Amino acid sequence: MRQKKRAAAVLLSAVMAFSAVSPAVPVWAASWQKNASGSYIGSDGSVLTGILSRGIDVSQWQQNINWSAVADDDIQFAMIGTRYNNAVDPYFDTNVRGAAAAGLRVGVYLYSYATTTAMAESDADFVLNLIKDYPISYPVVLDVEAQEMNGLTPSQIADIINAFCKKVETAGYYPMVYT
């Protein structure tokens, strides 16, 4: 089971890393369909290469989500926001439970304002405490794009990321980074 989770985390990380260096995907990505052979096709009928699965990133900004409709649209996973204005995202519980009930794999992310390793460890504690009773099957992600980090050196940012990821991995989850 642990190998399957690690493989899923590695796959998701690879997909997200590939996405980061790939050209921007047009808005019509929402209309992707699968052809008879199981490949995704664009709105113009061309086969899209490198697409392994579809997922969404949601938080309080999307408000009420029809998770059955999401699953019916060939979405296989959801990355759920955990925090908004230093409190639990008001839609976190509803989103995790709804996504899981619809059969989606669930991961979570935390938009971090950490500027020290102690703050990153506190962020990890916040997330780990929040998710302990939920069916998390995809990575626990640290989102490191806050303006507060702009003045930090690459070494300081790496230390922050490593502090968060170490705590998450020690707790039995697979850490990942959004940038």
Describe the role of every protein-language-model region.
Residues 22-25, 138, 174:
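Hydrophobic alpha-helix-in-membranes signature
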Residues 18-32:
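Sec-dependent signal peptide cleavage junction
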Residues 5-20:
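Sec-dependent N-terminal signal peptides
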Residues 1-3:
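N-terminal secretory signal peptides that target proteins for export/translocation
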Residues 171-179:
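Aromatic-lined carbohydrate-recognition surfaces of secreted/lumenal glycan-active proteins
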Residues 35-42, 46-172:
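Substrate-binding cleft of extracellular glycoside hydrolase catalytic domains
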